[in-house]
Every structure is written in structure tokens, then in C-alpha cells.
A protein has these predicted regions:
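Short, positively charged
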Residues: 1-83, 87-354
């Protein structure tokens, strides 16, 4: 993006135009580049920057004066643009490498507020709101299972899966400290009375990955109950809403255009994301459908049929929302991860960078 023909030299130069990159971050980038483990990621980012520098839609071979890194920061205000970079105070760029996640929000923000007012953080226990009986039944079954297993034993293999992220691999020590002094026999009879220490104990004892075999039937019934209730709640909210605006929020389309530079399993991803005004000039919604899915965790699938106003073409955009515990089973209130299942380059309103 800043020109030059060699990535190593560009890193060594630490260009002053990158105004928000600290010396410590430059040191880390140098170390990672020398290590070679992320060679493909560095190369893809370098090539995407070069493409944006040359693109007619982008910088048109004009070296930028200011490049600001905004990634990893929660943006203030009601802003749908997931911008990681801001170039010359004008160009907004989202960096998306091998990710289908559109947003990570509170379930109420997705299903009740329809993402109006921003994507928001997590608050409250969604499971307790939408499927209290199934939630309690699962917890009761978990208690019975744990009481049949010695306190020092884990109940599932340490593999990543339901309700977990890679961050949980480093969280074990903290969980053990928080759960210290709490035994299975001390756990309350009601899931609604769990303390932070109780939840840490459950997370540690249940482990990462799939549910233990004796708990899978109860977990499946719980997941379906949550998905059914959540889908019904979402449909009720959509029935009286402006569905076009809801779709724009799901697709992160707003009043400002921006660019997506990244990679998918199909190769480089270089897109220009139009505004809501652009979208309306070209497309309209024919149908917005929501269904509960039978999965190992609560999943709600969404499917939108879109017509092109300038032709007879129609496109189906599909995705799903996983409603899952944050950082492990029972650990923290659930979050809603919105996924886009349709490839980005096929989304109406996402145009190739030229």
C-alpha cells in the first residue's frame, strides 16, 4: 500500500505514514516475519496492499500520507463499518482473512433489537430468557453426571468445540484459581443461582470440545429448545421491521463505502462495499426466512432472496447465528456469532475491487 518491492525492507523501514503502530508492535511484526510461520499471511497482506495502491477504486498509485490502524478497538457510536484501517482520513478498510464471522454481539442485540443501535456487547443470560425449563433440565443432568464422577476427573477430552475459542487454551489456570474452594456438592440446585466461581468449576469439569456422551442427548434437546424459541422471537421482530435495513446491518452495509482486503479459502478477497443507497438502486428483498437448525449448539439459520432491479436475476444470501456460551460451557452469558455462509464475492452490494 505504501509502495516498494520488498516486504522485508518495508518492515525494516517502519514507515512514518503508519502513525498508530507502536515500536513494540513493529518489533513483534519483525519477529513474526523472521520466524516464517506466518509467511503466507504476510505475503497475502502485502499483495492486497499493493492491489489497493494500484486500484482505480482505491489509491490509483498515489502513496498515502497517513495510515491508521484501528483494529482490535470497539468503535464508538452506531457504526456498521468494521474498519481496521483508515487511509488519508477517507478510505476505510476491513481486513478479513479466512473468517466468515460478520459480528459477535449480545443475542438480544441480534434477535430483539435487530442490530439497531450498533452490535453491542454481551449482557444477561439469553438461555434463561428463551428456554428456562430446557436450561434447568440440562443443568440438572450435568449435576447428576458430575456427582457420579470423582472431583479430580475431567468429563470430556480437551479438544476445541462447543462454546469455546482458542483463547480458552490459556485460561485454565485462571479458572482453577476462581473455582478454588468450590466442589460439585456446593453447586446450587438452580442454574439461575450460579456464581462466577460455580461457573468456573463447571467449565473446568466439563472441559472443551464435545459434550460427554452421557450428556449429549440433554445437550441436543437444550440446543433445539433454544434455537426454536430464538427463531420464533427473531421472526416476530422481523415481522414489523424494515427487513431491508436488517439485512444491511447483517451484511455491514451502511452510509459510508469501505473496502474488504483479505483472503478466503478460494484465494485473495478484494472487495468494495457499497452504501445502503447503492444497494437500494440495484437490489430489493423478495423474502427473508429464519429457521432453527438441529446442531450440537443452538443455531438459527437465515436466508434472504434478493432480486436485481436491473435484470431478472435473483440471488440467495444465507448465513447462520450461533448462540453459544462465551469462553466455555456455562462460563459466561451466551454470545451471538453471526456468520455469512454465502461467499463474500457473491453478495449483492459487494463489488470486486478494480
Amino acid at each position: 500500500m505504501l509502495g516498494g518491492s520488498d516486504l522485508g525492507n518495508a518492515l525494516a523501514a517502519r514507515p512514518a505514514e503508519m502513525v498508530s503502530v507502536s515500536p513494540e508492535r513493529w518489533d513483534l511484526l519483525d519477529e513474526l516475519h523472521r520466524g516464517g510461520l506466518f509467511r503466507q499471511e504476510f505475503l497475502a497482506a502485502w499483495q492486497n496492499g499493493a492491489a489497493f495502491l494500484a486500484a482505480r477504486d482505491g489509491l490509483r498509485r498515489r502513496r498515502p500520507l497517513v495510515v491508521e490502524w484501528r483494529g482490535g478497538q470497539r468503535q464508538p457510536g452506531d457504526e456498521p463499518v468494521p474498519a481496521d484501517l483508515r487511509i488519508d482520513h477517507v478510505f476505510l478498510v476491513s481486513c478479513k482473512y479466512l473468517s466468515k464471522i460478520v459480528s459477535n454481539s449480545a443475542p438480544a442485540a441480534v434477535f430483539d433489537r435487530l442490530l439497531a443501535g450498533g452490535h453491542g456487547g454481551r449482557a444477561g443470560d439469553w438461555y434463561a430468557h428463551v428456554a428456562p425449563d430446557a436450561y434447568q433440565a440440562l443443568y440438572r443432568t450435568v449435576l447428576d453426571q458430575l456427582r457420579s464422577v470423582p472431583d479430580g476427573a475431567e468429563t470430556s477430552a480437551p479438544t476445541f468445540g462447543l462454546g469455546d475459542s482458542i483463547d480458552d487454551a490459556t485460561a485454565g489456570a485462571a479458572d482453577r484459581v476462581e473455582a478454588a474452594g468450590v466442589a460439585v456438592g456446593d453447586l446450587p440446585a438452580s442454574v439461575h443461582e450460579l456464581s462466577a466461581a460455580d461457573r468456573a468449576l463447571l467449565k473446568r469439569r466439563l472441559g472443551r470440545g464435545r459434550w460427554p456422551l452421557p450428556l449429549r442427548r440433554a445437550a441436543d434437546e437444550f440446543s433445539l429448545a433454544v434455537a426454536d424459541s430464538t427463531a420464533a422471537r427473531w421472526r416476530r421482530a422481523l415481522a414489523t421491521a424494515d427487513q431491508e435495513r436488517v439485512l444491511w446491518r447483517l451484511l455491514r452495509i451502511g452510509s459510508a463505502p469501505y473496502f474488504v482486503l483479505g483472503a478466503s479459502d478460494r484465494g485473495p478477497m478484494r472487495l468494495r462495499i457499497g452504501t445502503a443507497w447503492d444497494w437500494r438502486q440495484h437490489f430489493r428483498i423478495d423474502r427473508f426466512a429464519v429457521t432453527a437448525a438441529v446442531r450440537a449448539q443452538p443455531v438459527i439459520e437465515w436466508r434472504v432472496v434478493i432480486s436485481n432491479r436491473r435484470s431478472a436475476d435473483t440471488t440467495v444470501v444465507s448465513g447462520h447465528v450461533e448462540v453459544r456460551w462465551s469462553h466455555g460451557k456455562f462460563a459466561q452469558p451466551p454470545e451471538a456469532k453471526v456468520y455469512l455462509d454465502t461467499p463474500h464475492h457473491l453478495i449483492p452490494g459487494y463489488w470486486p475491487l478494480i
